[in-house]
């Protein structure tokens, strides 16, 4: 988030723009996704993919990963300086799936990074179009958020695996810029900071010298990003303490973990954007849609409308349920991994179930999986209604701080209560309220204790019919207040491994 006073919308962050009016924002976001679409079409031509093969989400992901790898300056430099066996630093590639005699075949392709960069720039009016690259990173991050659990990563940094709802964007690369910072959850920022502090504890030179100065600047910048996500004065004051610490150590780690726990009830503001796979934008461009002229928004009706009439396919393993695979991708498309299932189900128009009950693994297929038994099916990515994506944590009473369940970070701006187990959360706060941050800790705990699970968030906000593009008639759903829905309860998903 930029400093107060120059708050830019996500779209501006996403397109690297300075302050623009709504029409200019819509046009520049449109230009960004249009560029992605043009690039995708060109890549399909290069690879001689049929329209059918081009609609396969696995092919889309391979192509997206190739362009991200082609523009990864730091990794490219590293690869050139540390040549490893069997890795050509100048090439990038991945699995492409083709339809042959009624079966899907895997083919590993290899391309010059330079060539990929040329195609990308050509599709983006000769520019590097970093915003489009970030957009693809956020789509991959949203897919990871819906697919994997981060229990191991949480435990490694001393956090509680039940804090998974704070982990949005935990797999985003460092280079994802302001748009990336906006979508990172409180837990993700805390984890990045704890890793940094731990390195400082173990490595005496981490904060020293010319490099240490740069490290320090990065540390303070990350602290400010996290501070900007908190909505209460006490949480922000604690972040100032962490940032200004002369020599960050265990006290800072304690404070950060305390703050992460507090965010389960006093929620942070985390942005949500619907970032779709490149093939979806490609389909639209190919059908003659002019994104720049029509304008586009990541937080309004546009992504819903795009998904209403695009057919995306996915490979399906023998014992996977295609409907479950569709739910996974739908959640990823709308950045709804941490949303209340009651809200997601209402918007989608079909029941969205917790991940522990899904019979599906990740979207990507490992190179050792047998293609003989692979089938494909059309993903059902349509919705019954649409709703505006939110950037607030849904805190009530003057939108300051309020209730939250262990495990929800609202995506849609739709009225609901945010049920939570206060006993479970408060149990984590026994004991330590001494030290420099004692008064802030006491204040935070007091606010958490006064939060009521029955309070309504997003008062008066509703969903809209897909024909209601100007959002004139909100339909405010009524939810069963007792039956909260978290995607992560009873979870048995795979861990995310880089």
Swiss-Prot record:
Subcellular location, principal: virion
Q: Where in the cell is it found?
A: Virion; Host nucleus
Query: Which cellular components does GO assign to this protein?
Result: helical viral capsid; host cell; host cell nucleus; ribonucleoprotein complex; viral nucleocapsid
Gene Ontology MF annotations: RNA binding; structural molecule activity
Pfam families, alphabetized: Flu_NP (PF00506)
Identify the SUPFAM superfamilies for this entry: flu NP-like
Q: Which UniProt keywords apply?
A: Capsid protein, Helical capsid protein, Host nucleus, Host-virus interaction, Ribonucleoprotein, RNA-binding, Viral nucleoprotein, Viral penetration into host nucleus, Virion, Virus entry into host cell
Q: Name one GO biological process term.
A: symbiont entry into host cell
As annotated in the record, motif Unconventional nuclear localization signal runs over 1-18
Protein name (Swiss-Prot/TrEMBL): Nucleoprotein
Please tell me the species this chain comes from. Influenza A virus (strain A/Swine/Hong Kong/126/1982 H3N2)
Taxonomic lineage is: Viruses, Riboviria, Orthornavirae, Negarnaviricota, Polyploviricotina
């Amino acid at each position: 988030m930029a400093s107060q006073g120059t708050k830019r919308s996500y779209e501006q962050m996403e397109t690297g723009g300075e302050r623009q009016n709504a029409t200019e924002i819509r046009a520049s976001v449109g230009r960004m996704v249009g560029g992605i679409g043009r690039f995708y079409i060109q890549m399909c031509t290069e690879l001689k993919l049929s329209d059918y093969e081009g609609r396969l989400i696995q092919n889309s992901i391979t192509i997206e990963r190739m362009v991200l790898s082609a523009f990864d300056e730091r990794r490219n430099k590293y690869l050139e300086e540390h040549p490893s066996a069997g890795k050509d630093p100048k090439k990038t590639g991945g699995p492409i799936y083709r339809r042959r005699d009624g079966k899907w075949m895997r083919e590993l392709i290899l391309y010059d990074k330079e060539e990929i960069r040329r195609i990308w720039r050509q599709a983006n009016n000769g520019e590097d179009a970093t915003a489009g690259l970030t957009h693809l990173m956020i789509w991959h991050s949203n897919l990871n958020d819906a697919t994997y659990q981060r229990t191991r990563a949480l435990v490694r940094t001393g956090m509680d695996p039940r804090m998974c709802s704070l982990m949005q964007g935990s797999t985003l690369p460092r280079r994802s810029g302001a748009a990336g910072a906006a979508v990172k959850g409180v837990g993700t920022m805390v984890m990045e900071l704890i890793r940094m502090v731990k390195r400082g504890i173990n490595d005496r030179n981490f904060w020293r010298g010319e490099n240490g100065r740069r490290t320090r600047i990065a540390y303070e910048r990350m602290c400010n990003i996290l501070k900007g996500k908190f909505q209460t004065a006490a949480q922000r004051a604690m972040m100032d303490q962490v940032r200004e610490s002369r020599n960050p150590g265990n006290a800072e780690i304690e404070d950060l973990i305390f703050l992460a726990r507090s965010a389960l009830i006093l929620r942070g503001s985390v942005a949500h954007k619907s970032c779709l796979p490149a093939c979806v934008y490609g389909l639209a461009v190919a059908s003659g849609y002019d994104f720049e002229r029509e304008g586009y928004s990541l937080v309004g009706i546009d992504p819903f409308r795009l998904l209403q009439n695009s057919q995306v396919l996915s490979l399906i393993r023998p014992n996977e349920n295609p409907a479950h695979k569709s739910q996974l991708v739908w959640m990823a498309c709308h950045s709804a991994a941490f949303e209340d299932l009651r809200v997601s189900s209402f918007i989608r128009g079909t029941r969205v179930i917790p991940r522990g009950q899904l019979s599906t693994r990740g979207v990507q297929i490992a190179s050792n999986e047998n293609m003989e038994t692979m089938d494909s099916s059309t993903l059902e990515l349509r919705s019954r209604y649409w709703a505006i994506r939110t950037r607030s944590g849904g805190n009530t009473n003057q939108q300051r701080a309020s209730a939250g369940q262990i495990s929800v970070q609202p995506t849609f701006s739709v009225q609901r209560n945010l049920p939570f187990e206060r006993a479970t959360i408060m149990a984590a706060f026994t004991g330590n309220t001494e030290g420099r941050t004692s008064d802030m800790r006491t204040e935070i705990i007091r606010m958490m204790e006064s939060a009521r699970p029955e309070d309504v968030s997003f008062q008066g906000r509703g969903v809209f019919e897909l024909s209601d593009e100007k959002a004139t008639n909100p339909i405010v759903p009524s939810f069963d207040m007792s039956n909260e829905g978290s995607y992560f309860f009873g979870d048995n998903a795979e861990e995310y491994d880089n």
